[in-house]
Amino acid sequence: GPGTFADFLHIRVMDAWVHEQDIRRVLHQSGNEGGPAAQHSIGRFSRSLPMVVGKRAAAPDGSTVRIDITGPVARTFHIATNAGKAAHVDSDVAAASSPICTITLDSNTYVALCCGRQFFASGDPRINFAGDVALGERVMAGFNVMI
């Protein structure tokens, strides 16, 4: 839909960086995995996590899912469900209720899954689960969020 010029530019930064990583992956020449464009892109992808956790994975109401991203762009996201809606919550709020599931993966895997460059397969050694593994696998199966 319609957006601002700033929105357009934010998406272009993400788009250019993702395609750079596509080319690097094909050429087996990693690089620029942790700079400002990578950080910006991972931040943009994180906006879709509530939809993935709440809607696609159908996390139970009142639960929290923690996603730990390691590697060049390390981040931790807590997504909580309440009254049929999911949203990012800060670590203080998340600490009040233990996560029902924790998913740990590196930032390169996170990006490849978010962009639909790779698809989740149960048993993928790059992805670790603690807690409700079935929920974690549903979250990962819904990770393709690239616009």
Set out the residue ranges of the language-model regions.
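Short, contiguous alpha-helical
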Residues: 1-54
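Acidic/histidine-rich alpha-helical segments that form the ligand environment
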Residues: 9-12, 61-65, 75, 87, ...
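A glycine-rich beta-turn/hairpin centered on an aromatic-Pro dipeptide
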Residues: 39-81
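A short, terminal or domain-edge coil/loop segment
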Residues: 40-56, 84-92, 113-124
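A broadly conserved detector of short glycine/acidic/proline-rich loop/turn motifs that flank catalytic sites
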Residues: 69-73, 81-85, 107-109, 133
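Acidic/His-leaning functional-site neighborhoods
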Residues: 74-101
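C-terminal interaction segments
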Residues: 94-147
